[in-house]
Amino acid sequence: MRSTTHVCAAMSLVLAASAAPGGQTLYNGIVLPEQWPPRRAELSREPMPVPYLKSPPKVIPIDVGRQLFVDDFLIEATTLKRTCHLAEYHRDNPVVTYDKPWEKEGRAPFAAVFSDGVWYDPTDPDGPGFKMWYLGGYLKGTCRATSSDGLHWEKPPLDVEKGTNITMRHYRDSSTVWLDHAEADPTRRYKMFTTLSKDGWRLALHCSPDGIHWSKPLAVSPKIGDRTTVFYNPFRKVWVWSLRISYSGVGRARAYREHADAVEGMTWEQKDTALWLCADKLDPHHPKFPQVAPQLYNFDAVAYESLMLGLFAIHQGPPNSQCARLKIQKRNEVLLGFSRDGFHFHRPDRRRFIGVTETDGAWNWGNVQSAGGGCLVVGDKLYFYV
């Protein structure tokens, strides 16, 4: 494959109880089915059905978060027209680039989130501020950057590898760093779910009090697909594993796994997972390769106000072998979805929320990936990082 470079960028968008098992009622009045998570018989190119939109609760409590009109869940009748907005790239992009020797190691220079995580930590002993964990050097390790405003980033040296901002040197693919505000143990405030090459890809869970010094793996998962990620659903107080799978007819897709405990949840059997998400017939195609069917390359999610915000990385091809032959990037762009039960995602707008350029060598040439943690609320804007 042709050597490529990857850097991190920022976008902004102007803001327009315990885990409930099957049969129980959620914070918004939705009653979960007896079998939870739901068992989809198959994945197909048809858009995902969203049961709570077809049959909403008779009474909808609205005392959790601001209520967002991204669907008709809260609307009985209206003459208004819903308008969706797209993210805007910041004028100073890329906000993080490969400017350190260790970021130029591996098959290609790399300094960008590959999920990983971008967070604002209000209780950091060194002072509140923005923190970014990113892939530094292609598959070579995880680095950490800091910022006072979320736009201008620095890479202060750490004591893990003297003179560098490396927090963990490890052969990795996908990784998620999560700031767990609900964690009672201060040594586990930060959680890193990172891929581990051990007889195929597996997921290892590390914890840290500061996001710099990480524990040895507290748990290692069964075999997984390389682009597997994890997020926390605070409405139901469960961790969710977004498991990368391949499925006949739709290609790259997702299986679902949830557990209230991050460590215990790292061990599962096939029966503990459920078919979940895939690209469908409404997703965009590559403008130069329209014959290639879209696939779901990755899926991250985060709680925002009164719902779960999903970031769908839609792969539009061409296949890796063809990319190598043509010396181009495979095309991945980020689209949005919304969920009120954490499983069924409504996707009303299929435009490219965070798009790419076809300009050879540009920082966002062909391929962008969402950050773990989804987005940050900064004033009256949302900051997204890719």
Features from the language model and the residues they span:
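Bacterial N-terminal signal peptides that target proteins for export
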Residues: 1-9
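Carbohydrate-active catalytic/glycan-binding domains of CAZyme proteins
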Residues: 20-386
